[in-house]
Regions:
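N-terminal Rossmann-like FAD-binding beta1-loop-alpha1 element of flavoenzymes
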Residues: 1-32
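Functionally constrained cores in energy, signaling, and assembly domains
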Residues: 16, 21-23, 65, 150, ...
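Residue-level detector of anion-binding/catalytic polar loops
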Residues: 22-24, 132, 163
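General beta-strand structural signal in soluble alpha/beta enzymes
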Residues: 27-29, 74, 135, 164-167
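Conserved N-terminal/central alpha/beta ligand/cofactor-binding core
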Residues: 33-37, 41-160
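A conserved beta-strand/loop element that lines the FAD pocket in flavoprotein oxidoreductases
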Residues: 158-170
């Protein structure tokens, strides 16, 4: 049983399927399937405080379905994971996760690997200011593509036999 169909729940289900394909999986999610989530703010121009749950943050893929979907592909940004598990292993996990996103339809184009004289000059100025300019490759999904990508994952999980119980809150 997996509680929540946000990123942690989704990737847990994917890993169980890969390593124990015969294992029965039930995902319990208090929100809706990704293809049934529509924020009324797009039509009204203001937050309607959806009840019982916000359509932006709750449902399959969590807030990721409505984000612009930027995936940072370097261990050098984003938190303490490299300190906790080591830089090499952190990068290995980032690459592994990125590969999964590609399998489900992420654009192969990566931005953020910029070089050239202008970047070298900015890097020098950053060093003089006590800062570090980090080249960070970014895979940009885009809001529309993120929703389709998560729908692809949702459909895949269901095809693999994952039972999904939506609109169900756990106490």
């Amino acid at each position: 049983i997996i509680i929540g169909a946000g990123p942690a729940g989704i990737f847990t289900a994917l890993e169980v399927i890969r390593h124990k394909p015969d294992q029965k999986i039930l995902m319990v999610e208090k929100g809706k399937p990704v293809d049934k989530r529509h924020c009324p703010k797009a039509e009204t121009g203001k937050c309607m405080n959806c009840k019982p749950n916000c359509m932006i943050t709750t449902g399959f893929s969590g807030a990721g379905a409505f984000s612009d979907g930027k995936l940072s592909l370097s261990y050098e940004v984003g938190g303490d994971l490299p300190t906790l598990i080591g830089e090499d292993f952190a990068q290995e996990l980032i690459n592994y996760t990125d590969k999964i996103y590609l399998e489900f339809g992420a654009d192969e184009h990566v931005e953020g690997n910029y070089e050239g004289e202008e970047i070298k000059e900015i890097r020098k100025r950053a060093i003089r200011a006590g800062l570090q300019l980090v080249n960070c490759p970014i895979r940009h999904l885009g809001t529309e593509k993120a929703q389709q990508l998560y729908l692809n994952i949702q459909n895949y999980l269901q095809e693999k036999g994952v039972e999904m119980l939506f609109n169900t809150e756990c106490d």
